[in-house]
Amino acid sequence: MSTQYPVLGSPLQVNGITLKNRMITTSMSPGAGYVTKDNRPTQRLANYLEERAEGQTALIIQTICPWKRNDIDPDHIHELPSCYDESCIPDLQRYMIEPVHKHGGLICAQPYYVHDWKPDAETPEGPYGPSDIAILKFMGGFRAMTLEQIEAFKQQYFNAARVCKEAGFDAIEVMAGVGGILSRFMALATNNRTDEYGGSLENRVKLTLEVIRGVREVVGPKFPIVVRWSPIDFIKSPAGPGLSMEDALRIAPMLEEAGCDLHDLSVGWHETSEPLTTKAIEDGHWTFVSQQIKTVAKKPVAQGYRNTDPRVMEQNLQDGKLDVVAGLRYSIADPALPRKVMEDRTCDMRLCIVCCRCLDDVVSQDKPLNYCGVNPRLGEELDHEAFPQASKRKKVMVVGSGPAGINAALTAAQRGHAVDLYEEGPRLGGCVKMSSIFSPYHERYLDYLLTQVKQHPQVTVHLKTKVTPETVRQAKPDAAIVAVGGKPLGFDVPGADGKNVVSSHDFLEMINGHKPAGKKGAFNSFMWGAGSLFLSMYYTPSFARTMTEKSPWPISRNVAIIGGGLPGCEFGHLCMETGRTTAIIEERKKVGFDVGGSDRFGLISSFKQAENVEMYPLTRVTAITEEGVRAVQTTLEGDKELFIPAKTVAITLGLAENHDLGEACKPLVDEVYLVGDCETPGRIADATKMGYRAACAL
């Protein structure tokens, strides 16, 4: 029994099953590699599920398809396991059910009914709903279902439930949320029918209730039925509004009367423009929804979205806001998180940093689930054990201590190698030391990495050590993993070396205790030197965050940011929130061109709505002066010269590859690997995976 998380780690009865704790995973479809092109689950999916069952997830909900997908171009399909008849059962058992049951886990099948449906063998798969109403034009083409098709839909659902129970699933989830077929029937915004399935709320909920009742008849009284639905959907159309909380409070008892054993609440639809899952939303924010539903519900209530911190989960459970925590990203980040909760291992929890890489890939770009900011074991990495023991113990030199370097060091050590981790600065962390100033989520990841390094006896840390070829010769490693980070991209315009100009690299240098080179002006030069000395001894991300918010140096109250990619946008957001007048200048067509799809809309919207932010896309800087930035902007009318006033000019153009040390090591060491930004500049997920891969290759 957990003492730190007494409710989160406690069991809960849901009809005929007992959840071993209060942490369940919501449905997902991880895509290619996890499922074959002909929609059969693979060993990769089995390994993915087994990791989470072994990690003590109370209930794993997994998406499966109730129809045979025989008419879709294999190159344009998001693969799903199938449950259309008994022929699917052996694969479901081998690759989904048995890997979970092997560890005493529970697995719930969710028949896939989001937008697409295939009513019969002859009809192509496509989007269906109660009416031909689209919330977004690019997510349109909905076909209004006939009464005959509605009956076929129900029978297909009941058949899927029968197959899933026969296969050995422990529960079934009815998908009635996120803009799927059933949720479109429930919302007036997408249902303008005039028959028994349209009009009043009772009519619009009728199909969902018929599905639940029919599933209950198929599975029997003791088999749990979970219902995923969205009490608040944040959508509207000329036909009317979406669901309101007033509607939801009437719907919840109807669902229970029909046979719902557990409410699995989501928020919004796929078409919703409101930020739902990004770091703009605080952890546990959406529990106000479950708290309202609990006022009328007699069955347990789970709430999904933005649940990443077990301490927040526990507090919300203790406050009675929900009965079960539903989520997916916490499990993608750390498959063993529930076990660590039950064992009170808070320092060992690898928490989600809300980078949304998983969502951007799977949902926005229809890619497989291959990347996570903190967990390298996704995609092909699941095809082998996590830390295969090395056949020969090697002396491994890891140079650089960002996410690539530390993950490489920890992985190599776990495999049995002796690891020496070198860092030129006074503390570990690499670029995460700086990104933690902008993101408390990165700060907690940094804390996790430092804790793991400190705990591992096979990792020896060398701080304040600049590695040169001579260092390598003296160390005589069997293998070297070089993770020294990228080189800052140059910016050659008049005034780029002015005393009012700063760069992201300047801040990283200062955090590492080094005075950035070339700082002009006596006061300016003194401050950079003093700041570097101070931070070399007393730096913490939260302290630097507070100082950045309050201090007028080195960032004044009037800032121009050159470079509107992810680094510039994150810095711009900090400037916006701290009340600075901010200009973001970008040569490309869009500011935030490389920001992930999950974050970009909300981020750019916040810039547009802010009175203290101006964005300048298609704008080329020609000079920097002490008063600001001279630039040329391309418009429909032609090029236009601009002057953008600014007391501070921040250059955030990103990084270029940095192969110098890696190439110098190759004549000296048998095995040399370049990882992270020094090999290929990218996001934190790329660095994390590259470090892990290199260590596994030793």
Regions found by a protein language model. Give the residues of each.
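Short, contiguous acidic/charged loop-to-helix segments that flank catalytic cores in large enzymes
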Residues: 276-281, 385-387, 393, 433-444, ...
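Flavin-dependent oxidoreductase catalytic cores
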Residues: 1-399, 403, 407-419, 427, ...
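Structural/interface elements that position substrates and couple domains in central-metabolism enzymes
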Residues: 417, 433-437, 505-506, 512
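A conserved FAD-binding loop/helix module that cradles the flavin
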Residues: 568-571, 595-596, 675-698
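A Rossmann-like FAD-binding core segment of flavoenzymes
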Residues: 443-490, 498-500, 506, 515-516, ...
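Beta1/beta-strand and adjacent pyrophosphate-binding region of the FAD-binding site
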Residues: 392-402, 553-565
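A short, gly/pro- and small-residue-rich
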Residues: 339-346, 492-512, 663-676
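Glycine-rich FAD pyrophosphate-binding loop
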Residues: 417-430, 581-592
